[in-house]
Amino acid sequence: MFKYYGVFNIPMYLTLFRIIMVPCFVAVFYWPIYWSPMLCTLIFFIAAITDWFDGFLARRWNQTSRIGGFLDPIADKIMIITALILISEHFHVWWMTLPISSIIIREILISSLRECIARVDNKNNISVIWLSKVKTFAQMLALIALLCRLNEWTVIMGVISLYTAMLLTLWSMCYYVYSVSSILLQYKLK
């Protein structure tokens, strides 16, 4: 349908847009006006929608690229980790920091593991599993609810979703580490 013009195509622009939106929602998060949580949540939601949309369009229009495959997960991590840090800083209690730090540690560990596997064996890679998709959904639900903070029930729903995301995060991390352990052991033996 659309002609491919090298690296810069619509899916790539959406990925770059997502990265550019991060400083915007950070700035809005700290605005000292009563509706800043709603605007911050709206910006985050729009950025999150582009995450789904850029992958869909890249596959649909056959505009996938190596740089897009590299930048897309980085844009996701930047957006999610920034939102998690803002939420942790806002609530400033251990029972929020615990799941948030667990999720951040997992994101860094799995990203490092992907890089390690790519260097050791380019034939194998860590593909996304259904569990990670469920984790991402719970995580996005938690982030939207906790950024928005409409009322007490929204915060409670956000905290429940955050702990659900943490459990799914740890489960998927164990799965990923187990699934690549044979590749890592082969590399260690060489």
Swiss-Prot record:
Keywords: Cell inner membrane, Cell membrane, Lipid biosynthesis, Lipid metabolism, Membrane, Phospholipid biosynthesis, Phospholipid metabolism, Transferase, Transmembrane, Transmembrane helix. GO terms for biological process: phosphatidylglycerol biosynthetic process. The chain crosses the membrane at residues 18-42, 66-86, 92-112, 151-173. InterPro entries: CDP-alcohol_PTase-I, CDP-OH_P_trans, CDP-OH_PTrfase_TM_dom, CDP_ALCOHOL_P_TRANSF_CS, PGP_synthase_bac, Phosphatidylglycerol_P_synth. The keyword Nucleotide-binding does not apply. Pathway: Phospholipid metabolism; phosphatidylglycerol biosynthesis; phosphatidylglycerol from CDP-diacylglycerol: step 1/2. One of its GO terms (molecular function) is CDP-diacylglycerol-glycerol-3-phosphate 3-phosphatidyltransferase activity. One of its GO terms (cellular component) is plasma membrane. The keyword Transcription regulation does not apply. It is a multi-pass membrane protein. Residues 43-65, 113-150 are periplasmic. It is found in: Cell inner membrane. It catalyses: a CDP-1,2-diacyl-sn-glycerol + sn-glycerol 3-phosphate = a 1,2-diacyl-sn-glycero-3-phospho-(1'-sn-glycero-3'-phosphate) + CMP + H(+). Its EC number is 2.7.8.5. It is an enzyme of class 2 (transferase). Gene3D superfamilies: 1.20.120.1760. Residues 6-17, 87-91, 174-186 are cytoplasmic. Catalyzes the conversion of cytidine diphosphate diacylglycerol (CDP-DG) and glycerol 3-phosphate into phosphatidylglycerol. Essential for the synthesis of anionic phospholipids, thereby playing a role in balancing the ratio of zwitterionic and anionic phospholipids, which is thought to be important for normal membrane function. Belongs to the CDP-alcohol phosphatidyltransferase class-I family. This is CDP-diacylglycerol--glycerol-3-phosphate 3-phosphatidyltransferase. The gene is pgsA.
